[in-house]
Amino acid sequence: MEDFVRQCFNPMIVELAEKAMKEYGEDLKIETNKFAAICTHLEVCFMYSDFHFINEQGESIVVELDDPNALLKHRFEIIEGRDRTMAWTVVNSICNTTGAEKPKFLPDLYDYKENRFIEIGVTRREVHIYYLEKANKIKSENTHIHIFSFTGEEMATKADYTLDEESRARIKTRLFTIRQEMANRGLWDSFRQSERGEETIEERFEITGTMRRLADQSLPPNFSCLENFRAYVDGFEPNGCIEGKLSQMSKEVNARIEPFLKTTPRPIRLPDGPPCFQRSKFLLMDALKLSIEDPSHEGEGIPLYDAIKCMRTFFGWKEPYIVKPHEKGINPNYLLSWKQVLAELQDIENEEKIPRTKNMKKTSQLKWALGENMAPEKVDFDNCRDISDLKQYDSDEPELRSLSSWIQNEFNKACELTDSIWIELDEIGEDVAPIEYIASMRRNYFTAEVSHCRATEYIMKGVYINTALLNASCAAMDDFQLIPMISKCRTKEGRRKTNLYGFIIKGRSHLRNDTDVVNFVSMEFSLTDPRLEPHKWEKYCVLEIGDMLIRSAIGQMSRPMFLYVRTNGTSKIKMKWGMEMRRCLLQSLQQIESMIEAESSVKEKDMTKDFFENKSETWPIGESPKGVEEGSIGKVCRTLLAKSVFNSLYASPQLEGFSAESRKLLLVVQALRDNLEPGTFDLGGLYEAIEECLINDPWVLLNASWFNSFLTHALR
């Protein structure tokens, strides 16, 4: 059949049919009858239009190709054969210029003389059956239907055949010739039997039994059964008077649909106020590690043993003092807490055998820092019923904060490469099926791009800290346990490395519910001077605890070493998600995979290798005030990973709300870019919903700023 089609039809028609099948994901090597049907339909549409013009008096005339008057206006606009986006653009343009009602489905032609869209049908069955199917699907009196069959029959709306008899006879003769040619090659019977009707999903699937009863019970008010609701939905014109439809649905709804134009959207308003502060559970770009390479000490792998070994690598300890106090805290208590950690670690080293875990003495400074006995007493509600002025205590509205540059710097740093390898994916057996081979290849390429990434370090650090804290919270509920903040990696040469970032001391942790809070004090090493960006460190008390020799291009230099101390809290559910931060790798890999799939479907072959090995190609990474930023595929992988990791590190209700609400605006803007002529109602309400999520969260504020950059460049 494929050979017949290529011989029988004009190469341009064959090419258009191939494109159409590719657009719908159909294989012309398998669906050969469909290939023939599409070519036939295209040819009939072109023949319908051929030689028909409108003269200066507005009359329809037939003019042969070589006629010198062929510069007359074409009577028919051909819509069939264009890709969907262009076809809808043509339809929208016709509707705008002629005032014609926009059809629900893409028609085949537009008749400028009769001012109507035309749906052409070519059937191998009875013309009246096919006509009814078309009419039932289109459900519009404004689209004219004209059906031709291979037997010479035809049927049209109100028996109005549009064209003169000679033009229609030419089409019928061509269809009869195609049928004869197919029959001569033994292809006709298969072609005739392969035609499917204009079915809809509802006609194919009957809902019966329990599902039917559930459907009848689940209807909106005022509908007695599924049929009534279906009839209402089928008659609901999406491009009709939406305002009227909304008022039908509810008396409270009163909406005016406004066209959404390039000039309609305004930037999202970011809050004013003091700069936002760092609120992650551990330091990110400012963290400093004390490391040991190729650890082989006694008890290697036991966190406390590893921590003591890492602490011994540093010789620049000095008497600690406060360099940046916490505005609201009792700062001497933070200083005393660090001194207590040093003293108790020294005590451990003096013991014959180092214990596996260390519970801190419950000193006054730790009790204060961990909020011991600070929780208000819980009283049974029944005992309070008689108190006349019983009310919930007033809570202050959170203070609005403005966007600060440090969060963009944090994100940029998270996308960078480090000199260590942070993940090694386990071997998962031989690839058997081709899909497994492709999946492994993609995973390996992706891993190579992100294994050195700083965002991957944050994942492993987050997994370790949350796992250790949850374990300690369950195993030592009443103890102030000392938990080293550790990560493990490999150097570029493949040597194992253990890193210590600092310590956590956890408070009492009787966690019954998922949201019950465990308090902890974090103490983290850093070389960042807090006085450079004091607003970032609002929640911290920062001590100077030593001097570190740093090797640089100009030789060794001494830098002060700081300890960032703060009180913090988390819950079982937050720790559970923190332990699963490796999911971020999967999410970003899936995003990359969808890019590869899109490219592969266009090129009709797996593009994984080309994608990762074509170093000259650049891809869009994101928006900045300068415009669309582009980079290598590796940069795209690392940026997507960093976004996913930051969504985890800075998870909050503000982020949930902003993501959900801004997505609605994003979809409308994308519809505008795709020339789909979107309309909106209560756009002000949508902006309000977006902006009420912009309070004080640094990551949400940065995302809002990125969104504004996107709006600026998307609507140019």
Curated annotation (Swiss-Prot):
Where in this protein would one find the motif Nuclear localization signal 2 (NLS2), according to its record?
Answer: 184-247
PTM text: Phosphorylated on serines and threonines by host kinases, including human casein kinase II.
Binding positions (Mn(2+) 1): H41, D108, E119, I120
Tell me the InterPro entries matching this sequence: INFV_PA (IPR037534), PA/PA-X (IPR001009), PA/PA-X_sf (IPR038372)
Tell me if Hydrolase is a UniProt keyword of this record.
yes
Q: Which Pfam families does the annotation name?
A: Flu_PA (PF00603)
The answer to whether keyword GTP-binding applies is no
**What EC number(s) does this enzyme carry?**
3.1.-.-
Question: Where does this protein chiefly localize?
Answer: host cell
As for what it does, the entry says: Plays an essential role in viral RNA transcription and replication by forming the heterotrimeric polymerase complex together with PB1 and PB2 subunits. The complex transcribes viral mRNAs by using a unique mechanism called cap-snatching. It consists in the hijacking and cleavage of host capped pre-mRNAs. These short capped RNAs are then used as primers for viral mRNAs. The PB2 subunit is responsible for the binding of the 5' cap of cellular pre-mRNAs which are subsequently cleaved after 10-13 nucleotides by the PA subunit that carries the endonuclease activity.
What family is reported?
Belongs to the influenza viruses PA family.
Quaternary structure note: Influenza RNA polymerase is composed of three subunits: PB1, PB2 and PA. Interacts (via C-terminus) with PB1 (via N-terminus).
Record-given protein name: Polymerase acidic protein
Which species is listed as the source? Influenza A virus (strain A/Memphis/1/1971 H3N2)
**Gene behind this chain?**
PA
